């Protein structure tokens, strides 16, 4: 059995339609395996507005069509849910996301 250990590099995007990009890096070869851009740049999120009612509405609206489990880690929905909509504190949301992901995240501002 071959195990590939991943590290995720998280970037805040300075331009374009998305807020962030997560790149999955093979920790042994240091090569990018997959990347996911997420978070519509023109919209707010829980880490910005900190409104629990808006968070609940977001979660209810997206719950049925997105995979928020570890198997959905390569989807924008997974990243938006855990990084942008899990906690009003970005640093706490980052820790929550890392726990849900099961892999190390390196935030590269």
Please place each PLM-identified region on the residue numbering:
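Arg/Lys-rich, low-complexity, intrinsically disordered basic segments
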Residues: 3-109
């Amino acid at each position: 059995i071959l195990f590939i250990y991943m590290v995720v590099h998280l970037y805040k995007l300075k331009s374009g339609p998305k807020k962030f990009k997560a790149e999955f890096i093979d920790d042994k070869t240091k090569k990018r395996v997959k990347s996911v851009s997420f978070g519509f740049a023109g919209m707010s999120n829980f880490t910005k507005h900190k409104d629990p009612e808006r968070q609940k509405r977001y979660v209810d609206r997206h719950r049925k069509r997105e995979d928020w489990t570890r198997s959905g880690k390569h989807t924008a929905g997974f990243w938006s849910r855990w990084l942008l909509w899990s906690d009003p504190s970005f640093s706490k949301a980052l820790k929550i996301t890392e726990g849900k992901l099961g892999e190390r995240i390196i935030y590269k501002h």
